[in-house]
């Protein structure tokens, strides 16, 4: 039987996801170059903010693509748990990039409010409309893959790019109707707030995994109850639960069981491991046993 940790690469449908990442990168990068050029020509901060976000998305797609490649490598003597956390690190880096981008949008928008600049509303609206179609198409590619944290960070990137394009379209229309360029900055600030909130959630979740916190969705006390549900288990301590990747959780603990022979103790451990997989979604368990007769009086 294969050791699951030694085959972490089997977790992802790599071929399909790799193709999605490649397609998304080419389409997004092409549109980003076009949007930057029009943003500079039109003087629109909303377009430049959206183009900057698109640029970060291209970088994000590239990071995730290579993280995916690394994560598929089999475990070895130096990396016994495999390389699954490469994807978590990718999510963390992507989240930080987005946080910094949101802060930069605030800085530029406030500067434009203090010192307004001419904005060509019709160009802004036209490019933004194309951006909505491009970003929505790419976001939909990853909609069903969000259970992977690194893909969720990519989906958030693309979703907010689509939202930013909607904002840029609205800004362009308002500028055409009112001749007031302040709408460009105000909508940029709103986009920045929404982006900051979502990107910080990705950073927080990735940091939690990297610091080996108990994975979200798993209650350590309930896991302990699952172990103690075996009538022969008398005590559980030194319980550790952590995520190796978005989809792979590990556990180690020490249990005290009633005095029994080696064969019976192995059956107890196998049963506990099976229950942990079924009830708590914990794939890899290391359980140290101690017999009651070994305990000091």
Predicted regions and their residues:
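Alpha-helical transmembrane segments and adjacent TM-loop junctions that form the membrane-embedded core
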Residues: 2-12, 16-19, 23, 46-48, ...
